[in-house]
Design a protein with these regions (language model features):
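Short beta-strand edge/turn micro-motifs at domain boundaries
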Residues: 140-163
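Flexible low-complexity loop/turn motifs enriched in small/helix-breaking residues
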Residues: 1-123, 127-136, 156-167
Length: 167
């Protein structure tokens, strides 16, 4: 998870806010007419890693601290998140978030990584939420390098949202 977080950090990011619970199985990563082998080839991972990712993300889990990030981070407690986002108006909720975390660009949510049977390749789902009309979700492929460190090898955009064009 740390490798994916560090890979996506831009120079202007002062703090990362990470949702304190994993995403769970929030997105169908495979189109209905695609085999898992074809999906694995497209993503640059293994079918086993995809199966493992789906298996371990059936439920949400609490994240623990200890990420090795190059930027300071805050693990957002679920109760605090619920308090910040309790209003019916999404704009008000994001105003609450920005007041609580003025040095953060948004909230990162991550799945548990699915690791292949050789423990050399991993698949991770990562979302970035930056407003009520701002966010994206990606599948991140990681591999162990020669020094046994996880490195991002590729990413695939799953979804993206942005404000509508006023035209």
């Amino acid at each position: 998870i740390s490798a994916a977080l560090n890979h996506g950090i831009g120079g202007e990011v002062q703090r990362i806010v990470i949702d304190g619970r994993t995403t769970g199985l929030v997105v169908n990563i495979s189109p209905p007419d695609t085999t898992r082998e074809d999906l694995a080839k497209e993503l640059g991972t293994t079918a086993y890693a995809i199966d493992e990712w789906a298996r371990i993300n059936r439920a949400r889990h609490t994240l623990q601290t200890g990420f090795a990030t190059t930027t300071p981070y805050t693990l957002l407690d679920p109760a605090h998140r619920d308090e910040l986002f309790k209003d019916d108006d999404p704009e008000i909720n994001w105003t609450h978030f920005r007041a609580a975390f003025p040095d953060a660009n948004g909230i990162v949510r991550v799945s548990r990584p699915g690791i292949d049977d050789a423990a050399r390749v991993a698949l991770l789902y990562l979302e970035f939420q930056c407003g009520h009309e701002c966010g994206s979700g990606r599948l991140i492929n990681l591999a162990l390098d020669a020094t046994e460190s996880w490195q991002v090898t590729s990413g695939s955009l799953v979804w993206i949202t942005s404000p509508e064009d006023p035209e």
